[in-house]
């Protein structure tokens, strides 16, 4: 005998809630990765600065100003796009952009060749939070949105803390290539 009526409706609602929480967990993992990535350049400063012949000012620009300006300004633009475009595709674009340019920064030979990818990494990472917040608002009722946002933002301290063992693991590997962020 098949289920019908209230039982079927309750099962469908339960499955939908499970998907909502799975999306929340995935978005939180993306946020963790966002903050791990953001911290790694500073973690490798003792290797990158001499390797690229950077001054302290140049390195400060790479880890601060160049990234933050693009991240902050583009965050406003990406928030607008998140309200208008297909959010999962926009998030995938941001992830691909920041991941690809993080990898490309490993080929940097000096300040300018590291500066350009860092600016664009800021653009890619700026997609994550406004898009995630819009996706969460679509999936969670207003009475649960505070919990969902709090869970998502838990990724910030976890990502910062996780960057330390990640950088240590890379530093203990036998090849110089692993140092590139």
Regions found by a protein language model. Give the residues of each.
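Residue-level signature of mid-helix packing/kink "hotspots" within the transmembrane helices
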Residues: 39, 68-76, 160-161
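Extracellular/periplasmic helix-loop-helix junction of adjacent transmembrane segments
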Residues: 44-72
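Helix-breaking motifs and short loop linkers at transmembrane-helix boundaries and internal kinks
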Residues: 53, 86, 107-112, 141
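Conserved small/polar residues in nucleotide/adenosyl-binding loops
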Residues: 169-175
């Amino acid at each position: 005998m098949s289920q019908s009526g209230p039982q079927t409706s309750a099962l469908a609602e339960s499955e939908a809630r499970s998907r909502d929480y799975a999306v929340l967990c995935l978005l939180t993992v993306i946020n963790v990765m966002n903050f791990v990535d953001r911290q790694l350049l500073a973690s490798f400063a003792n290797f990158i600065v001499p390797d690229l012949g950077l001054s302290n000012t140049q390195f400060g620009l790479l880890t601060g100003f160049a990234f933050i300006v693009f991240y902050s300004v583009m965050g406003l633009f990406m928030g607008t796009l998140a309200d208008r475009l297909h959010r999962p595709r926009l998030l995938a674009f941001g992830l691909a952009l920041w991941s690809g340019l993080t990898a490309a920064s490993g080929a940097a030979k000096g300040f300018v060749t590291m500066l350009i990818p860092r600016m664009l990494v800021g653009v890619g990472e700026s997609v994550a939070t406004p898009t995630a917040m819009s996706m969460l608002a679509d999936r969670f009722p207003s009475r649960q949105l505070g919990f969902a946002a709090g869970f998502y933002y838990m990724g910030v301290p976890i990502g910062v803390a996780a960057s330390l063992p990640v950088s240590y693991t890379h530093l203990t590997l036998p090849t110089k290539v692993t140092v590139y962020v």
